[in-house]
């Protein structure tokens, strides 16, 4: 007999998100985690000296800022379970080799003032670029945290308007195409290209251009944040929410396989041999390359397409340091200390940077290393003992080395990490033996070992962010709706799934799909709540009184504005805009109108409509 409604493989932040929604709706959930901590890619641990709290993977929370999980506090993480974000006025900064610095402030005017000191032309272009991206956000963001449409259907919709075709164009271009079109100065180009490449995408990779537009727009609209106490505090608040609603998390519990019978997922078997059954569903936090390992009965074409999902061209080398005192930057620009994302740029030109990106693709270790990092205790003293400091650095590196393959990382880990430390010393004056208490290096191979079922070949975002692996085709068209064809009641979550890797809260979309399949009403279960997020928006209450008809989604975000309803021949023609800016014309013929009337005009619905006509907004 099943003891749980839903069983989840893994307790990463995506599994926690999905199970949090299910648990709040009354489902009894069990999460089985192979580690002795929850969070997966959003985890904070004392890995070296007691009192120093390091983020194991993700550190910066960007895409999740617009998620109703946060903006509407749908799981009461802020209200009840201790979640709290710190926002910085400086989402991103770059220190260059000459110790000059360029800041992306959340304030667009202030950002442009700084850029104007380098290039007035580029500062003006940057303002227009951000405004273009912000005009697209209403088209993109409302659907980001729901099940995604098929790629072909989205393209057909975009191709129906001029604004949509602009988006299509950017989606298919490379970041470098877009950066070169808009900007001229190498420092500004490198500043933007380096920030966008944190998504593990090469600047000249076709099909990644839209990320460049969205990334800059998001920083100036929603900002960039870190949880107080570390990235893992998000996961810890989710654990408390699940346990408070009757859910259970078991640690040091590794799943061997998903139990399938009659084409339906029934439960799981642990590596200990224990079997646990689920009444309603099983959630698998697994990479598409790993489905064959865990699930029997999946058709060979589906498996082969899953195993052909493309990975990022490079991975990360991560360094953690416990310091006696906070880091001291060599640059005179003090605002870099506020930056949540801080790039240390050794390259003198965009051409030099591009050559080293090309080398990464070939599996080469570059002489000038890509580095980013910061002392997170400068803005969050809870991360370290009083008066101490820390250094958390990431840098791009290939998983499969041209010389020696991935296994060579075990041989060169310390030497490579020490060279990275030496190069970072060009920017930080006290990253040395006098100040370092302890350190730990994670190679791309170590990242895979830490999360073998999600971060294959060290791809911390699951799969590459390419155009053909976007929206409902991420990671493949078969799997883009969080389901595995031919296996009922099995749902997939994790960084490989839509809309993107990183801390997005993508498990919300998976939960919406599960609610529908289980006959549950997601919309009525999760109403808008109060939140400590700075990004809470209620579109309905802010809509102008301009005579237009507006349609809103379940989170009170505007979906469509109807500007006019006319007749043409024997059709009703509805004109307006979707998501605030995209023109839309819809035509209803006689048959469509009869069917609509039949849907709307039952006696009960008719009386409701009459009452609505005489009610106040």
What are the functions of these language-model segments?
Residues 185-202, 366-374, 430-498:
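A glycine-rich dinucleotide-binding beta-alpha-beta segment and adjacent secondary-structure elements
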Residues 256-383:
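Mid-domain catalytic core of redox enzymes
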Residues 216-265:
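Helical element adjacent to the flavin cofactor pocket in flavoenzyme catalytic cores
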Residues 495-515:
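A conserved FAD-binding loop/helix module that cradles the flavin
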Residues 2-138:
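N-terminal glycine-rich phosphate/pyrophosphate-binding loop and immediately adjacent elements
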